Amino acid sequence: MSCLDEIKTMTLKLLKKIFSNSLNEYYSKEEINTLFYILIEFYLGINKINYIQDPLYIISKKNISLIESKIKMIQKKTPIQYIIGEVEHKNIKFKVNKYVLIPRPETIELCDWIIFNQKKKCKILDIGTGSGLIALILKKYITGSIVHAWDKSPVILKIAKENALKNNIEINFKIVDILKNVKVNDKFDLIVSNPPYVDKSEMQFIDESIVKYEPHSAIFVEGNDNLIFYKKIIQYSKDALNSNGTLYLECHIDRINFVKNILKINNFKNIKIKEDLFGRKRMIKACI
C-alpha cells in the first residue's frame, strides 16, 4: 500500500517532501525540484512562486493520487516530457509522445543558427520533421516563408499536423521516405534535417530512459551504413536546392567530418561547422 493511500488531503509542502523522498534514489535534489515544479504547474496550475508564497496550500485527495501516479512513472524513468505530453520551445507548445523524439537543446540551436543567417523569406523543406519542431519554429520566425515538412510515418505526421494546427502555423506536410529514390518535383531555398545518426552498436552508451521510451527509428540507423540518411539527403538536396540554396544538418559529433566530406564530394561549397553550447561540433551548413 502506498504511503499516500490513506491521506485525504495534504499541504503542498508535505507533498513536496513525499515527492522528494520517493525519488531521491533516482535523481539529484535539483532534478527532483525541477520535476516537482513542472508537475504541479502542469496538473495543478501551481507554479514555483505560488509554492513559495503558500507552501501550506491544501491539495485534494484527487490531486494527491494524480501526482502519485506520475511519481511511479518517473521512478520507471519515463521522460517528464512524455508524462505531461508536451514541450515548449521559442513560445511554441509541441505535443510529444512515444512516436516522436523529445526535442534536444542542440536542435533549438540549429533553428537559431538558421534564423540568424536567413534574413529574408524563403522556401524551406524540413526532412524527417517528427513533432514538427524545426518546421514550426522556422515558419514562425522567418517571416513570410513557405515551409514544407516531410516524414515517412503517417502516425508521426499526424502529430506534427496537430502541433501546427494548435499553434495556428501553416505548414505543407507530406508523407515521404527520403531513403527511397525521391524525385525532385520542387525547388527550395533552404533544406534542413535532423536525421537518425546513432549506430545501434552505440545503444549501450545511451541513457536508459532514451533507449526505453523514445522512438528508435528517430535515433538509431538501421543497417551497416550510419551515414545513409546524410548521403540520401545530400544527394536529394544537390538537385532540389535553388542556386545558392543552403542545406543545414544536425550531426553526430564523431561523424560530422564524414558528413563534411560527403558534402564536398557532391560539390557543395561554403561549408561551415558550428559547435553547440557545450563546445561540441553538432551542426553543419553548406551551399550549392
Q: What does each of the following model-derived ranges do?
A:
Residues S145, W150-I288:
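S-adenosylmethionine
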Residues S60-S65, N117-C122, T143-G144, K180-D186, ...:
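Short, glycine- and charge-enriched coil/turn segments that flank and shape catalytic ligand pockets
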Residues P55, N97-K98, N194, C251:
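A secondary-structure boundary/capping signal
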Residues D54, E68-I142, V147-I159, K285:
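SAM-dependent Rossmann-like transferase core, predominantly class I methyltransferases
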Residues N63, P103-E106, F229:
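An acidic site on a long C-lobe helix of protein kinase domains
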Residues I46-N47, N91, V211-H216:
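Short, basic/glycine-rich phosphate-binding loops at helix/coil junctions
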Residues S2-I84:
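N-terminal auxiliary segments of SAM/dcSAM-dependent transferases
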Residues I18, I38, L66-S69, E109, ...:
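Alpha-helical elements of Rossmann-like donor-binding domains used by nucleotide-donor carbohydrate transfer enzymes
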